[in-house]
Amino acid sequence: MQTLSDVGLEKSKELLKNAVYGKKDKKTIKDKIFALLFQKLVYPQIWEDPQVDLEALELNEKSHVVTIASGGCNALSYLIASPEKITAVDLNHAHVALVKLKISAIKELDYGDFYRFFGEAKSGKNIDNYKKILYSKLDEPTKEYWDSGILGFQRIRMFKKGFYSFGLLGKLIGFLHFGARLYGVSLEKLLIQKNKIEQARWFDLHVSKIFDSNIFKKISSSPFALFYLGIPPKQYLALCDGRPENMAQVLKERAKHLATVERIDRNYFAWQAFGRKYDHSNQENLPQYLQFCNFNLLKNNINKLSIDQNNIVDVLRNAPGNSVDSVILLDAQDWMSDDEISTLWIEITRTARQGAKVIFRTAGVASPIDSILTNVLANKWQRNNMKSDYLWSKDRSGIYGAFHLYEYQN
């Protein structure tokens, strides 16, 4: 008998096939493997900086936001701006179940229990709170997702074992830490550097040699190696500018940017990558949705957030015209064909209110839309070059080639 969780998985498979394969006549083995991997939990934490997003979007109490959810961290952080409505969407049923669990926890738990659940994310008390408080509040597909798992390991137990070590990205980070130790490098030592100068010096002295090694160059020259970063074959080529032999150098530059773009006591992305945890002693070095000062506001605004398992194009297609103020695409367009990007922007334009803004990241530097949109569409959207480049320089996640802010000029 098929469970509701199985239905969510089947929907993930169908949505991901459409996203990865698009209109390709021939599906490669790389595409098939990536689509299979991406049906699982990929991002226990989202890897776009919400602080940058909020500065770009300038949300207010009348804003309707449409965003790709991923792990839900940023959709929750946007609530701090008290917009009228946030419509979150994701292809992956695991991400949808994670967002629904977070929503329920914000509604039902006090701050201490909420932070233990999603900040520390490594306590048996989390399982108790799930069973006694949250379980009865969740819908059936979400219950079934967290109660099931491989070989009898219930997924909810990830929050006892250390949630941020799971997911494709969490496992990859763990593998990188293991590999670094083989070179005699403890990546956690970045966390004790006192300023950005020391962080850069430490990286150059201890970490650069790993990226420069022949074995790393060999491994990173294969697209399969980056699937655990959630990077599909098309985005892999954009990341290395079509030259796989240069991928190790590209990854070194991005890793150094992550390690040095901000002081380590102000960059929770670097803490997760190099320390595999959050900085529990420093509230200011946490995602906004995990900070105590924002918790009551989150509780008050949580009903403004909805989450749906769907394609963002279909969500926009079903929205009324002139109804959306902000669209956050993450790096989704790196996956898309030219026709798919054009279709997406037709719907974005149809639903856009006056002054609407769209933000997204790209693996490479160039924007994918400038050469794709028809003159009619292109004339309605203007890239804010100065602000885009400025905000990219501040983005603490440090892994993307560019940040793009487009503003509606109707």
PLM feature spans:
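Conserved class I S-adenosyl-L-methionine
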Residues: 61-70, 86-87
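Conserved beta-strand signature within the Rossmann-like core of class I S-adenosyl-L-methionine
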Residues: 328, 354-367
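A short glycine-rich, Lys/Arg-flanked "PGG" loop and its adjoining helix->strand segment in the class I
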Residues: 341-354
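Class I S-adenosyl-L-methionine-dependent methyltransferase module
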Residues: 2-22, 94-296
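Conserved acidic E/D residue at the C-terminus of a beta-strand in Rossmann-like folds
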Residues: 88-93
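A short acidic, Gly/Pro-enriched loop at the edge of an enzyme's catalytic core
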Residues: 60-63, 310-326
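Core SAM-dependent methyltransferase catalytic element
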Residues: 386-410
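Conserved alpha-helix/loop element of class I SAM-dependent methyltransferases that forms part
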Residues: 41-64, 341
